[in-house]
Amino acid sequence: MEAALDLMRRISPKKSETALSALLSLLPHYSSDLLSQVDLPLQVSTDTTSMKDFLLCEYNRDADSYRSPWSNTYFPPLEDGPLPSEELRKLEVEANEVFSIYRDQYYEGGISSVYIWEDDDHGFVACFLIKKDGSKTGQGKRGNLQEGSWDAIHVIEVNPEEDGTAHYCLTSTIMLSLATENKTSGTFNLAGSIRRQMSLDLSVEEGHLCNMGRMIEDMESKLRNSLEQVYFGKTREMVCTLRPPPEGVQICIPESRPI
Amino acid sequence: MADCGDEADEAGAQAELSDKEKKDIAVWFLSNAPVGEISYVAKDIRTLIGDDRLYDMAASESFPRHNKAHLLTLELPDRSGDVIITGYGEIDKNQYLEPRSAQVATVDHIKQACTGLRPATDDELPSPYIEEFRYALDVELCKYVAEAYPKGISAVYCTRGKDIDVPGNDFDLVAIISASKKSPQNFCNGSWRSIWTFEFKDDTQLVDIKGKIQIAAHYFEEGNVQLSTKNEFNDSTVFQSPEDCAVQLTNIVRHHESEYLQSLEASYLHLPDSMFKDLRRKLPVTRTLFPWHNTLQFSINRDLSKELGIGK
């Protein structure tokens, strides 16, 4: 398992799907461990009832069907597919609605889905997904990217306490890939994936959605910064180490560490 | 119960994973190893395959390919210089020409080390006429590489017409520049590879120039981020004396490589605004943090705009 995870952080994130399927065929006994520890870019399906796209993950899957957050039904149709309780479904509907607006404001497009289900204890788990195609043939408004994909997976465990607070544990993964291509600079390709965790105890006075939303917004901004400043900065630093820019025009690279 | 069933099925599937499939998987991982990391990938995949015979087959197929593709440089056993592992200098699968010192290094691909060294035979070297051009270019290119790359290694090979001994014929030289930085303790590795082909054409009295530069960088401290770039160049110049050609060709290489580096810097500068913004903005279109406390407002607005038939 350790060797498998080491391979996953060495192989290019652009090839993670092939790498994971190879590891799954090699290590069938570890399939659930691998699937839970390795994230892949999200797949999209269409809810033919509401004619809206939704995102697929392990959390809305049952057998070969996936539950749409819009109509609360499975596609392809599935009898007796598990559904969230009425109370959680209400929260799920609201979360999907609000998260769509959040997504529109930050992503100017893209697809989002939120799934909520009962936890083993008295709490619940919510999974917030976002996928954006920022390429010029997709929803890239500025049209600078030949290829540009962003996938965000936020899984948040919520455990309400007696005293009107709740414990929130958030695990977020961002996967992205961008490519530009033109005559002077050729092809320029950056791909990355990072995962971070964060836990907070918060008062539920303003509601779970408000707390979860703020945590996700904060985490997404941190991860985005980290990718842009630290991780991409490190690759740039490497280029400058291999072949330093001529003196005088050297652009200073801030020393930075990952969060 | 269902899970147990699945696992049994998958275990059955594993039994059917043939030796060839296992080897292919090993080859795939080794072939996709980032620069400087193939030995780590090899260690992992050897553990996962659990069959040394299959691993050895995969390794002996993948390492030479990887070493050549990444223009691996190895120090010569007598420490007189380095040999570049490239198809242009390949005599057979374990022997590579080092044209500057006119020696042939024996290479252990899997250990990534030179194990022997012998003088090159006359057959393996170009004619004195060609050597004049090759040598002059090597000298100029070395000066350029020393000034531009802190750890660059270069070599010039004759890849066509090496036995020509009088003017009036076509021949090709290939210049290679390979620079790499391996820093696994800092979780980063990277390489710069340039391949410049010069076609000396007698009928037009021109030298046609084709260049290819590839850069790779991997940073993997608590994450996995990879850069890969590639660009190609075309140019030409006048066929002159060996010395004049060498200066002229090196100037052209310098010009294209410097320009390329500048365009890379420009790409990095545009990253935050023009590229990243099309994925996710730093702040919402409203330029203020999302009003989570006031989301009820959104629902009302949305219902209202729906009723009024505006908005989405």
Residue spans for each PLM region:
Chain B
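A structural "domain/chain start" motif
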Residues: D3-I153, D163, E265, L269, ...
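Generic hydrophobic, helix-prone segments enriched in Leu/Val/Ile
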Residues: F29, A59-H66, S194-F200, A246-R254
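Phenylalanine-focused residue identity feature
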Residues: F29, F63, F133, F171, ...
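Generic detector of ordered, mature protein regions
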Residues: A58, S62, P150, S154, ...
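Surface-exposed short loop/turn segments
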Residues: E131, Y135, V139, K143, ...
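Short, Lys/Arg-enriched charge-dense amphipathic segments
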Residues: A179-N189, N251-E257, N294-Q297
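Short secondary-structure boundary motifs at beta->alpha junctions and helix caps
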Residues: E222-L271
